[in-house]
Amino acid sequence: MLSKLTVALCAAALVIPTAAEARLSRAETRMTQVVDAEQQRTVDMLATWVNQNSGTLNFAGVARVGEMLRAELAPLGFKVEMLDMTKAGRGNHLVARHKGNGRGKKLLLIGHLDTVFELDSPFQRWERNGNDGTGPGSGDDKGGMAVMVAALRAMQAAGTLKNADITVFLTGDEEDAGPVEISRAAFIEEGKRADVALDFEGLVQLDGRDMGSTARRSSGEWTLTVTAKSGHSSGIFTPGSGSGAIYEAARIIDTFRREVPEDKLTFNVGLIGGGATAELDAGKVRVNATGKTNIIAGTAIARGDLRALSQEQIARAQAKMQAIVAQPLNGAKATLEFLPDGYPPMAPTEGNRAILARLNGVNQDMGLPEMGELDPVKRGAGDISFVAADVDGLAGLGPASRGDHAPGETVDITSIFVQAKRAAILMSRLASERP
């Protein structure tokens, strides 16, 4: 028979919190419990979203996913509206506003409804295999929206959502944005009203360690067009015939490679073509060229991107590239055009690092390892960059995934729940602080 002391000790052990729970408030502990209790609900919700195609150009599909999100957010007290993006030639954005007590920091939560997988993609359905969830957008960014909704539901259950001022902005064209002066105008205005921006795109892991994203590089496009005197190839390199357009394009691009590089700056050549004639198609993804081996090339075209960490770095790189273009070989002329509709950079500011520090406070209280600061070279551009000049922010609050943007994209299901707990506690703490 157990002694009274033994029974008492066993009973006490049942109510003694773990070390991590002891560092969390009662409401925060409740949030972690709700996320765990709703795991199957969250996975089922994500599967439903994934099984609805919402490729960027499938406007009806984007709208249907938007309505699915409305059905999740409205019961939590959010006023939801869809912003018509017809003038931008894109699907609609979803904006949901939760009015709190007006005393805490105003939060802007960022994600996107669309995926890269259009209606003609063979990759269309969700499939679960243990901890892996495979399907279009399972990670990018329907998995991120699942983290967001799971966190907000946990906040409501714990009572921390009631007083929080939160705006959710889910774009319908993140993967292929329409003209930014139209498609991002309302989003930029929301950034100016917010105190903190949180981006629910994917979590990056390095060597098994979760990383915090305080910065994202820009993404812009450029087009190089070279023209030269065409003629019989027997005259190539002579003063009268020159070197032709292809040699000049090669000179320019190779000089870019040798003279423009600097830390955190990359520039890729993704398309090139030339010949006696060459022209881009309407979508600027193909070069239609003609030529013969005995004709000096009269035209060459190349397209590429440029990614940088600051506007100053962009300006510096563009100036170097233009200077190289301005020194043509004999008989050639070239123009270099930078397209204006790019994604700006999100620089690694001290304000952003302060939010990562707050998240690491959450990690410590949850008994999780500290998250290091990710090198921005290791992730692409994102919508948060459009508001980065106006508000402190943190990216990468979505789940971990692999194979994004390709058939077989797979989300780490366990990471959805870890990220939802982190986000719920972080948002609750930030929303209770004075701006």
Which functions belong to the PLM regions below?
Residues L109, N129-P179, G220-V226, G235-E259, ...:
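Alpha-helical metal-binding/catalytic segments enriched in His/Glu/Asp
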Residues M1-A20:
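Gram-negative bacterial Sec-dependent N-terminal signal peptides
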Residues R23-P136, Q156-K162:
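Acidic/His- and Gly-rich active-site-bordering loop/insert found
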Residues A47-G55, R70-K79, R153, A157, ...:
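Sec-exported extracytoplasmic/periplasmic mature domains
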Residues D141-A215, G274-K284, P435:
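Acidic/histidine-rich catalytic neighborhood of metal-dependent amide-processing enzymes
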Residues R23-E28, E221-T223, K229-P435:
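Metal-dependent amide/peptide-bond hydrolase catalytic core
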Residues V43-A47, G66, R70, M145, ...:
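Extracytoplasmic/secreted envelope proteins and their assembly/folding machinery
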Residues E118-R128, A215-S218, A282-V287:
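Short, flexible, mixed-charge acidic loops at enzyme active sites
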